[in-house]
């Protein structure tokens, strides 16, 4: 959140300078994605992540993880080879029922807990089920370990997402 606040404050003076990564963006091109890109480094879960199909090893989607008020959320940004054009979360219930998968929030409520993020929830759009979850960076920040579970973490399932370049 500090990065977003700093960048928003600096936007009002005419340019954005992200000193940590040496990025300059003109005010006309300033977007929240610039803040995400600047924050995407080996110590941060923020940024774009490739989700990998366990069975085929192929990339299924890109999920963008953002932070607001210290809480991480993740939204599907792009789908690769969807089974139907413009797929929706037809198995979801409640407010997410039949929402388009692109733009759907699938991670929410994750808080920093040392070198990981815990206390969040994970939506599996293929089943419509919601799980408790934890996130942790691996391989020098190149991979994100997502562990979803019901009840106790021991009985869950883990996926590894790869940072998108």
Where do the protein language model's features map onto the residues?
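Bacterial N-terminal signal peptides that target proteins for export
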Residues: 2-14
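Edge beta-strand at a domain terminus
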Residues: 141-143, 149-165
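Signal peptide processing junction and immediate N-terminal pro/mature segment
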Residues: 22-35
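N-terminal helix-cap/turn-to-beta initiation motif at the start of protein domains
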Residues: 33-47
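Central antiparallel beta-sheet cores of small beta-barrel/beta-sandwich binding domains
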Residues: 33-34, 51-133
